[in-house]
């Protein structure tokens, strides 16, 4: 009986720990999961909401992408700015983060450009019991979208071409839009960190190197953070 109560107590403690962590991570809610910056706009706004009972200091910045497989590396500074870089959100309040264009004329006009929007939140209250509260950082995809691009960005994933070669599978994206892959599987095996396929480019992968038949299935994430219909293909 004692062992049963001990196991129950441990289970309750574990659940409560998860709930506390969830509340802490949900202290600041960002109004979106990905963002589109149309080239005909001078700025876009993002709503930040503090749902917790403590104040948070928000630090935001825009960088070139580094963390998504298939992303195009660049050492050129991002010609976009997050303002203000620091925002204090008191309990139960909202704030607005503005993304501004600075030198957008250096960006391609025939395709999208991908950036990272990094938003870190730090509890701004006093340090208690000599403990330090660390920042929680979230990174969002930010797409710069030039005017007049042909085609429908919501349908771009349907034009993605998959071709086998001696190195694996080559992905070809003929559209001017980024294709953000998700739920990709090869012969029924799910793949992780499948990343993106940049516009008007090819991406080589090591998938399907074996001689055996190769069946691929995938979805894409659209402008609104939703999932596309599932696509499947047998690769000879």
From Swiss-Prot:
SUPFAM superfamilies, alphabetically? PapD-like, Periplasmic chaperone C-domain
- Key words, A-Z: Chaperone, Fimbrium biogenesis, Immunoglobulin domain, Periplasm, Signal
Coiled coil ranges: none
The stated induction of this gene product is: Expression is negatively regulated by H-NS and subjected to cAMP receptor protein (CRP)-mediated catabolite repression.
Q: Which GO terms describe its biological process?
A: cell wall organization; chaperone-mediated protein folding
InterPro entries in alphabetical order: Ig-like_fold, PapD-like_sf, Periplasmic_pilus_chap, Pili_assmbl_chap_C_dom_sf, Pili_assmbl_chaperone_bac, Pili_assmbl_chaperone_C, Pili_assmbl_chaperone_CS, Pili_assmbl_chaperone_N
What PROSITE patterns does the annotation carry? PILI_CHAPERONE
Return the Pfam families for the record.
PapD_C, PapD_N
PANTHER family noted in UniProt = FIMBRIAL CHAPARONE, PILUS ASSEMBLY CHAPERONE
Q: Which family does it belong to?
A: Belongs to the periplasmic pilus chaperone family.
Annotated function: Part of the elfADCG-ycbUVF fimbrial operon, which promotes adhesion of bacteria to different abiotic surfaces. Could be required for the biogenesis of fimbriae.
Record protein name field = Uncharacterized fimbrial chaperone YcbF
Origin organism lineage: Bacteria, Pseudomonadati, Pseudomonadota, Gammaproteobacteria, Enterobacterales
């Amino acid at each position: 009986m004692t062992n049963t109560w001990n196991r129950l107590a441990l289970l309750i403690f574990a659940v409560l720990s998860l709930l506390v962590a969830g509340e802490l991570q949900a202290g600041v809610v960002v109004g979106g999961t990905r963002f589109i910056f149309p080239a005909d706009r001078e700025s876009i706004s993002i709503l930040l909401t503090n749902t917790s009972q403590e104040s948070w200091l928000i630090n935001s910045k825009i960088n070139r992408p580094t963390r998504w497989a298939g992303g195009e590396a660049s050492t050129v500074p991002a010609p976009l700015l997050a303002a203000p870089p620091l925002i204090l959100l008191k309990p139960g309040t909202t704030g607005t983060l503005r993304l501004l264009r600075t030198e957008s004329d250096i960006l391609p006009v025939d395709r999208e450009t991908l950036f990272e929007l990094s938003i870190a939140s730090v509890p701004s209250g006093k340090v208690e019991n000599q403990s330090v509260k660390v920042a929680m950082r979230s990174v969002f995809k930010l797409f710069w979208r030039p005017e007049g691009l042909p085609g429908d960005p919501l349908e771009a994933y349907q034009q993605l071409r998959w071709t086998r070669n001696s190195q694996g599978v080559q992905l070809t994206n003929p559209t001017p839009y980024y294709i953000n892959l998700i739920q990709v599987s090869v012969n029924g095996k799910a793949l992780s960190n499948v990343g993106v396929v940049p516009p008007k480019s090819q991406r080589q992968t090591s998938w399907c190197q074996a001689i055996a038949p190769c069946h691929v299935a995938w979805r894409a994430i659209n402008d609104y953070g939703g999932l596309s219909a599932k696509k499947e293909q047998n690769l000879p």
